[in-house]
Design a protein with these regions (language model features):
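Boundary/linker segments of alpha-helical solenoid repeat arrays
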Residues: 81-85, 116-127, 180-189, 221-253, ...
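Bacterial signal peptide processing site
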Residues: 48-51
């Protein structure tokens, strides 16, 4: 007679009990498979933990050691893994940017940009594993606003290198990305970005392309107004003055008069006619840290005693987290009438800083300005999450329903397999272990670009050519200076434009 084991590939023969021998040795079989399934539960529960290096990265950046942050990210490359390749590139590119290693940053972010383009066209997703386990089994694709910010950071890198031609390439890429979004996205979902449009205008203007700069400024004005309900960003005063200045340079007298009427409070802030011999300092300030995502576990009891058990678990253990879910999964799995759904929620990391003060002095004359908030990443991240929340809820509910049904099916199958020997405990153990597996592997996708700031501020200051001492201070919401002033000595030629970057994590 043909050996039934021969039908199985050689790689399956390491199992002490094969599937074919289950019918002959039910007790031993289910002991082995019970232990194997339990081990698999704990293995998978530990596979999708959060990245622990972020705390050390934040500490290094706050201590003023961005190169250490770069090292920490690079050392964690294997922890990111293949499915999180895009996230790794975004994190590495950002910390290189903060470390002043702008060329290296752009090399990394260019790879991220190309990977996003590939994801846009192929959408390579292992949907089956996501449905059976959780969303973290999918390759990280990033949010639409994060895709836009890849090119924003690259554009800033080139501007910091004073490579204005390449900066314009990034401005055009930003335009293209937002135009594609506008074509694909319907309704009031995120499809435009006010700061990205504003930055393209700044880059066009510095490069001497005033017509495109003016178009970008006008578009940014419209988008700031249209998105204020969710971007939480009023129209920056700097953009108002930019519109007046460029309208005057282009001899658009009607437009200039329109803006003077529209923004009378800014008329005295725009010295006209514009003096092309004036040098310009642009300071981009990063304040705080971007919001992080956490799991929101929703336990759904389907009986009164299950409701009482959930209430008891919450009163003892508090809010469910990834660190305490094992005990709950064990209790709920034994009970059998409690389902769990995991959804992401944003946790803002609000900055203490209200603004920065910028002061330039040549020994006799002092020029000063206050930074203006031009981008609230907390608000934009919240908008992106809100846009996809209905879909996330539907997928999470469907996933939980399928997994719970599969768990019950395992119990039925196990009981059927051993019914001849009346070993009902085998089916009970199997279904309990399957439920525990379902509960422990349910988690939300909380991956995000956490090395971004919480806010971006922009300052533009026009000065005569010469040598200056620079002092930048961070000011909190009570008007108090935080930390030590950031100082530098700068020399400006006639008509020169220089961009500086400052970061404050408080």
């Amino acid at each position: 007679m043909r050996n039934p084991h021969s039908a199985f590939p050689q790689r399956f023969k390491f199992f002490p009990i094969s599937p074919f021998s289950c019918r002959l040795h039910e007790a031993n079989c289910w002991s082995w498979w019970r232990l194997g399934l339990l081990g698999f539960v704990f293995l998978l529960a530990g596979c999708n933990g959060t990245f622990s290096h972020y705390k050390e990265v934040d500490h290094s950046l706050k201590a003023g050691n961005p190169d250490k942050a770069v090292t920490l990210i690079q050392e964690a490359e294997d922890d990111y893994g293949r499915k999180n390749r895009l996230l790794y590139l975004m994190d590495e590119g950002m910390v290189l940017h903060l470390a002043g290693r702008y060329e290296e940053s752009n090399t990394v972010l260019e790879e991220a940009y190309l990977l996003v383009e590939e994801l846009y066209t192929t959408r390579l997703r292992d949907q089956a594993s996501a449905i059976l386990i959780n969303e973290t089994q999918l390759p990280f694709e990033g949010e639409p606003f994060e895709h836009v910010l890849i090119n924003v950071i690259m554009g800033l890198n080139y501007a910091l290198l004073q490579n204005w031609n390449e900066a314009l390439v990034e401005a055009r890429r930003i335009d293209h990305r937002l135009n594609v979004l506008s074509d694909r996205v319907e309704g009031d979902a995120y499809k435009e970005d006010p700061f990205a449009r504003y930055l393209t205008g700044v880059l066009y203007e510095i490069a001497g392309d005033l017509n495109n700069a003016y178009v970008a400024y006008r578009k940014a004005e419209t988008i700031y107004d249209e998105t204020q309900s969710w971007s939480k960003m009023p129209l920056p005063d700097g953009l108002k003055t930019d519109l007046m200045r460029v309208a005057d340079i282009l001899h658009l007298s009607e437009d200039l008069e329109e803006y003077r009427t529209k923004y009378p409070e800014m008329v005295d802030e725009v010295p006209l006619p514009y003096d092309a011999d004036m040098a310009q300092l642009i300071v981009v300030s990063y304040h705080g840290r971007s919001p992080k995502k956490e799991d929101l576990f929703i336990d759904v009891p389907i009986s009164l005693d299950a409701l009482a058990l959930v209430a008891l678990a919450k009163s003892v253990g508090g809010q469910s987290t990834r660190s305490n879910r094992e005990g709950e999964a064990l209790i709920y799995g034994i009970h059998g009438q409690i389902a769990r759904v995991a959804l992401p929620r944003l946790v803002p990391q609000h900055t203490k800083i209200a603004y920065s003060t910028i002061q330039l002095t040549d020994g006799t004359t002092t020029f000063d300005a206050r930074s203006q908030r031009v981008y609230d990443i907390d608000a934009v991240a919240e908008k992106n999450l809100d846009d996809e929340y209905a879909t996330l809820v539907l997928r999470a509910v469907a996933r939980t329903a399928m997994k719970m049904a599969a768990a019950e099916g395992i119990g039925i199958g196990a009981r059927s397999a051993v019914s001849k020997n009346s070993q009902d405990w085998v089916g009970l153990v199997a279904v309990i272990l399957a439920r525990i597996f379902v509960l422990m592997t349910e988690e939300a996708d909380i991956r995000s670009w956490r090395t971004l700031p919480g806010e971006i501020h922009l300052t533009r200051l026009w000065i005569p050519a010469g040598s200056y001492n620079l002092m930048v201070n961070a000011v909190d919401r009570q008007g108090r200076v935080i930390g030590q002033p950031n100082t530098d000595q700068l020399d400006f030629r006639s008509g020169e434009v220089r961009l500086l970057l400052r970061q404050y994590l408080e």
